[in-house]
Design a protein with these regions (language model features):
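Leucine-rich solenoid repeat scaffolds
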Residues: 271-324, 361-392
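Surface-exposed loop/turn motifs in large extracellular/passenger domains
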Residues: 73-78, 92-102, 120-142, 149-164, ...
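N-terminal extracellular ligand-recognition/capping segment immediately after the signal peptide
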Residues: 77-99, 103-112, 348-375
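Sec-dependent signal peptide cleavage junction
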Residues: 32-48, 433-445, 464-469
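Short, hydrophobic alpha-helical membrane anchors of single-pass surface/secreted proteins
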Residues: 18-21, 442-453
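C-terminal low-complexity, Ser/Thr- and acidic/Pro-rich disordered "stalk" regions positioned immediately N-terminal
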Residues: 385-441
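C-terminal membrane-anchoring or membrane-association module
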Residues: 454-472
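Acidic Gly/Asp/Thr-rich repetitive segments characteristic of extracellular carbohydrate-active
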Residues: 49-81, 318-349
């Protein structure tokens, strides 16, 4: 066998060995992936729905209800975490239990209800004296009349709560303790239902509810001594403070404070309800059917203020007309913001400002003084009842330059002086003929030097090319 054939056989064996090694590596990788997937799938099948962490102890349960029952009633915080979507019974949190329901991005769907004996209509019941947080996921039910019946201190953070149309009356009903809704949460009522309420019922003190952030879709009601603060977020629905009668009911006013929220709906005080608005935005009608007017000291209102609304405590009030739409701004903060955003063609009707106020209004805006005082607008006095259209500022006139003084005529030269001057000039000109032109000569020398350098460089390049050609 020739040396060439031996080398060829050796290379083939080497290639075959490498191929087998590569195939074994691929097999190991795929086996590892398959085994890992099997282990994960098996773990997912065996993993229980809920994990409870209480102190240093971690336990798993099949249902949320079992995990809640295992939490100690000693005010020590426990965390119940969903490991997957869970559908099952609701839960009752008892006095002195402190539980964080971490929904962990999953959904807890309640299909079996809890509550007082004979009235099991709640998805979750939070008893007086407990502390509860619901966060990071979705809580819903298609069977609950009240998704959450709350008598405790409750925090809803970054959670979505919803019910069933034509069945769920209230998503979060608050009769005691305090409730805070924050962290981009969503509370969505069933169609025509109540998103949350606050009501002093029976022997309870009334749940104090605060909306800090998030979306509320549905009505918001405070009744019979309930207290609600809408400090942020958006409510798409009506806001109502009222009372209803039942045996032994005290005529205690309900109270709602709007301080920063946006209300896409009507705001109404009824019976002996109290409502105050210090900032925020309302797109619907603000009115009072109560003995007490709605007190407004700030805010932006896209519908004309209705009956029994008191703005007497506000230092700044104006209405703004734009493209057939009108809004009312109340309070210095909202007044200043509205003035700064005025555009040409709009009208501002100033209703209340301090006397002799000095205002700066953009050009093209019509200003009407509907106060009883004089004001100053862009430096012009505007008396009560007057109006003005702000004109563009006129540029300052260009000052006329002063004429330059005429120089005195030069004296007539003496002929003898001219002769002497001519001789002097001739002598200077004859002398200048022998003066060297240093500037021009310098440039000439530079050009000649560059030419010689270029020629030398071309010669060297040509010589090098010829030498390389000969060497080949």
């Amino acid at each position: 066998m020739s040396e060439y054939n031996m080398e060829e056989i050796f290379m083939e064996k080497k290639l075959l060995k490498r191929s087998l090694t590569f195939a074994m590596m691929i097999a190991v990788v795929f086996s590892t992936i398959i085994a890992s997937s099997f282990i994960k799938a098996n773990a997912a099948e065996t993993e229980k729905a809920v994990t409870l962490i209480q102190g240093e102890k971690t336990s798993q349960y099949d249902t949320v209800q079992e995990a809640v029952a295992a939490v100690s009633a000693d005010k020590t915080q426990a965390v119940i975490t969903l490991n997957k979507d869970f559908e099952g019974a609701g839960a009752v949190v008892k006095k002195d239990q402190n539980i964080v329901f971490n929904l962990n991005g999953f959904t807890w769907t309640i299909n079996s209800l809890v509550g007082s004996s004979g009235t099991e209509t709640n998805g979750v019941q939070l008893l007086q004296g407990s502390t509860v947080t619901i966060e990071n996921g979705t809580l819903t039910s298609k069977t609950a009349s009240k998704l959450i019946q709350n008598y405790c201190d409750l925090t809803i953070r970054n959670a979505t709560l919803s019910g069933q149309d034509n069945l769920t009356e209230i998503i979060v009903s608050n009769n005691n303790g305090s409730t805070v809704i924050t962290g981009n949460s969503t509370v969505q009522a069933a169609a025509g239902g109540i998103a949350f309420d606050s009501d002093k019922w029976g022997g309870y003190q009334g749940g104090n509810v605060t909306l800090e952030d998030g979306q509320v879709i549905g009505n918001v009601n405070a009744t019979n001594g309930g207290k609600i603060s809408l400090n942020g977020g958006t409510v798409t629905g009506d806001v109502i403070a009222s009372n209803y009668t039942y045996q032994g009911n005290e005529k205690t006013p309900a109270n709602i404070v709007i301080d920063g929220a946006t209300i896409n709906g009507n705001v109404t005080a009824q019976n002996v309800g109290n409502i105050s608005i210090s900032s925020g935005t309302v797109t619907g009608l603000v009115s009072s059917e109560s003995a007490s007017p709605v007190a407004v000291t700030g805010g932006v209102f896209h519908t004309a203020l209705g009956e029994n609304v008191d703005i007497s405590a506000a230092e700044y009030v104006a209405s703004i007309e734009s493209n057939g739409q009108a809004k009312t701004v109340v309070g210095k903060t909202d007044f200043d913001a509205a003035v700064q955003s005025l555009k040409s063609g709009e009208t501002i009707n100033i209703q209340v400002v301090p006397e002799n106020s000095i205002l700066t209004i953009p050009e093209g805006v019509t200003v009407t003084n509907k106060t009883n005082n004089s004001i100053v607008v862009n430096g012009n006095a505007l008396n009560a009842g007057e109006n003005i259209i702000i004109q563009p500022e006129q540029p300052e006139p260009t000052p006329t330059p002063e004429p330059e003084p005429t120089p005195d005529p030069e004296p007539t030269p003496n002929p003898e002086d001219n002769n002497n001057m001519t001789e002097s000039n001739n002598n200077e000109q004859s002398g200048s003929l022998t003066s060297p032109q240093t500037g021009n000569d310098s440039y000439s020398i530079l050009y000649i030097s560059l030419a010689f350098a270029s020629a030398a460089l071309l010669t060297m390049v040509s010589f090098t090319i010829r030498k390389m050609s000969k060497s080949k």
